[in-house]
Structure formats: structure tokens, C-alpha cells
């Protein structure tokens, strides 16, 4: 399949919620987590948060439970239809617009978050202080964190969390032993703490993984910090790297990037960055073809992926050892480690270079996500597809084998709640659970 693209246009990717939908009062069975102020309810629509997969640590948000076999509602949101959009997502090119309100999801290893209009709800496992409430206890339902406000974007890591505010400030909290918090020390932070980086101006994009974190300034400079076990995932080069415990807790500029970047995604042991023109650069570990260059040569120096130099990428997402790229014409490519079926090519073979997922070729994909060893895609018609590791029911389709190597559509069981079929807007995937945000029209 030819993927030579002349220009990079993300023509409908801002996800402004402007469809002419009406909403009815939702069922009392699903908690109403958010609604506009009393004087701002003339133009509203109902969004619904659903979760599935393994939930022993509370990450599903529905109380104490072990597992959900299929997507189940967690909360309803009533939002202003004309002014809400999806919040900035790690690995996705940032829209120039800044709507009045934004909504977004994030899944960490065993914790989850929901962002609505600058406010952050967070829940799941609490070890290391990753929830930011001043303790390490788990929370089994979405709980508003009172220590943050005006949040624009959230990225959840393994045992830590990162938030970006509308003022361009970065806050981190949780386990600090890997240096992923960026506070020049390696102890835990039980409350959100401001990262005092050496950058000038505001930060406009963040990302994190299990052990390292990245941030991009408004001018396109990239800073990284956290763990680097000699694989080069921080992109900093010799003599600029880890010290205590293999971590670097000082945000440091990636000087070898020759051009400004607008989005970044942190994989397990590697890093991906996107330019404004849609060119994808990466660096770090490559023993499983994570860098998509056709060989296993890794390293700290950022380089473009040769086979994608004429392809316009609008979003990149990575798991532990694999990646997805979404092009501006709605195609999805995958590469890297494939033994759990996470590449979507109907096999469990590793993939040396990015290859289009043919099973999705008839769909126009608008959003992608990766878990540790699973993958997801949302289409322009609001459908959700998932594939990869299904051991913990994290694909949301009961009865699948533990390895699902081709995309399957996730179906939704809707109760008689006065709302119509779910129209999926976004998805987030953790190690063994997943969540999605759907729009519910009136039935």
C-alpha cells in the first residue's frame, strides 16, 4: 500500500464536540460526575466513561472488583456540546485551539484518571503516592484531586503521574526512585509538585512511561528525565546520563534533535517524537525492532524512521516493546515486538519496519492507543477496535484467546437508560485494563 503523502493535514482531529445531539437525564445507576454550572446548560451532551479488564487494584473505578469482561459504565458527564474537545494526548500533535473545556483519559500501570474542564479525577492503586492525595492507599472510585487545578493534560506512568496545566506548568508525584519526577531528588512525592525545569517559556506537551518522562516547550524544545539503563531512551548522549539508581532526576534538553517537535511519546525503553510536519523521530532500545529501522541497532541519537520519511504521522503510541503510528489519511501502521498479537497483522511475528494494519484498511482511524502488550484504534464512525494480549480481558470482548493477533470490534451492552448507542471518542489502555470515552445521543 502506498503511503506517500504530500502534506500533513489533521483536518478533523480537534474533536470539537459539535454534532447536533440532544441529551436526556441519564440513569441513576451510573454516577453523574460532572455537569456545567447552572447558567450554562443550554447546549449540553452526555459523555460516558467506561472501563474493562483487570480491576483488583481499583483501576476500573467501579468499586472493589476483580475483573470486567466488557465495557461497563463508570460515570456520566454532562458537558457543553459547543465548547468541549479532547484534551491534549501524549504522542498526538497538539491542536492550536484551546477550547473553554477539555476532557481526557489516561491509564497507568494500575491507576487511571479522568480530566474534565481543568479538574482531575484519579483512582486505582496508591503505592508510591501515585494518586497525589498525601497517602498511599488505593481508591476504588474516581476521586477529585483537590491539589490541582486548570489541568490540560495528564500522563500516568508505572508508579507516578504527570500533569500539565493551562499555565504551561508541569506537576509530578508518586514514586521517585527512577528520577521520573524531575525534582533533582529520588524520593517519593505524595502530593503534586511543580517541576522546576531549566526551560524558558511554557510547556505545551507531556508524556511519560514506566520510568521516564518528557516535556516539550512552546518553541518545540524537548526535555527528558528519568531512568536510562544504557539504552539511550533519554536521548542525552554520553556523560549526560543517569546517576543514582540508573536515573536522572534533572530535566535535560535533547540537544541532538535538529528540528522543533510538537508531540512526544515514551515507550518502555525508547522515545518517539513528532514534528509539526508529521515526521516521526525516535531513539533508545531496539532489541525488538522498537525503532522500526529494519535492524536492532539502538542508541541515544534521535533519528527519523527511514520508511516513514514521506508519510505524515499525526499520532504515535507505544507499549512496552511495540508502537503504532496514525497517518493523516486514517491508516494505522505498527512495528516492534509482536508475540502477544499487539501488532494486528494476524500473526505473532515481530515486525522490523512500520507496516499498515490491513485489517483496518477499510476504516478511517482517528485515534490510537497502546497498553503494555495490547493496542486500540477508534474510527471516524465511533467504533472501537482492539487487539493483542487478552489475558486479563483488557480487550473488552469476552471469549477471546489470550493472544488476539487481529483487530476485533468492541461491542457495548447498553441498558435502557434513555440514551442511544455509544459513539467512541477516545481510548486509553493500561497494563491489564482499558477505558474509553463515548458520546451518548438521545435514543
Q: What name fits each language-model region?
A:
Residues 64, 98, 106, 135-138, ...:
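Conserved loop/turn at the beginning of each blade in beta-propeller domains
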Residues 104, 108-225, 231-233:
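A generic tandem-repeat structural signature
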Residues 51, 111-114, 122, 160-163, ...:
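Conserved core positions of repeat-based scaffolds
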Residues 106, 114, 143, 155, ...:
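Conserved beta-strand position repeated across blades of beta-propeller domains
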Residues 383-384, 389, 400, 405-443:
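Blade-level signature of beta-propeller repeat domains, shared across WD40, Kelch, NHL, RCC1
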Residues 119, 166-169, 178, 205, ...:
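Tandem repeat domain/solenoid detector
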Residues 1-37:
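N-terminal mitochondrial targeting presequence
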